Amino acid sequence: MEPDKDAWGTSRHSRLFPGPWLVHADLHNHTTLSDGKGDPADAFASMRAAGLDVAAITDHSRWASVAAGLVAMPGNSGIDRYGWEAAGRIADAADEPGAFVAMRGFEWSSALYGHANVWRSARFTDPLRSGLVAMAPFWRWLERHGEDGLAGFNHAGSAMLRFGRFRHRPAVAERVVSFEIFNKTNEHLLLGTERGRPSALVQCLDAGWRVGLLGVTDEHGSDWGHPEGKGRAGLYVHELSRAGVYEALAARRFFASRVKGLRLDAALDGVRMGGTVPVRGGPARFAVDLDRAGWTGRRLGVQVLRSGPGLPTLAAAVEVRVPGPDEPPVAFEADLGGAGGWVVLRVTDPEAAADPPATGQWAGLGRALAYASPFWLVPDGR
């Protein structure tokens, strides 16, 4: 099924690229299988009723393996073998290809290094078995026992050691697909910079990780999918199935949002977000497809972010107006100031207050609404 409009009345079709179409997803949720408050049997129905097309249960894995599967462990210890199997049964029962995708995953939850989601894997692990005092054991698990999994960095702005300062691991880099830029109601672009730490996004991308940008609710309550203002994601899929979702994640063909029913797509010199762009010199041309029911004519800001010392460099900031269906998509040019590296587009509401700890020019840009996945710049080989 490929419906023309989503639950909020927004067209699912990008005006920039044919083919894949938009589905709304929340890929990070908790239940009583770990430290959530809601029955896992109710989670997928709640998210489907809330208008989501794709949902995942990703309960914490912590230290339940200490029991070696001999007895069931309490939820605050994270999932054990019994919880992992139960999550799989619940997801399989809720999954309806073509109508709604239900997925099982887990959140590897280290108090020191941070939290990472893993989807698609047949197995799970926890920090007690893979990473109590280092990141390397988790990466090795993902290489060997979790070789079928896709992974992502969760709420990295608040992580203590930030995955070992995001030290790059080439063997798993293609399967580490995401970075949560919105988690719950928090934006993780500047979180931690008020304490002198670098932007987690800059730190991650500069380390060489080619991740797309996700929004997630990280829901721990029992109203999955319903609260306003929490993160969510838009994926462009070829089919509404688990395979279609995994393909879109692997292609980094997705965006982060904290607004329900938003469509965002972006191109840099004709290359879609998440792609590699040859740099030919001169101004770069951006095209942005923005739409939401009732937003025609609304004033928004679009910022072009590049690497910088600690904080992102603001390469450009433009004011745009959401076009109507008979008007061309937003387009503008910007000087990227050098070849190589990465580019991220950020969409803001200039009339709403920026999230703490934004100060200076960042405070003046307003509240972040969405992010496109990064573009990766490479020298033109012609």
Name the predicted role of every residue range.
Residues 1-382:
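Extended, charged catalytic domains and RNA/DNA-binding interfaces, predominantly
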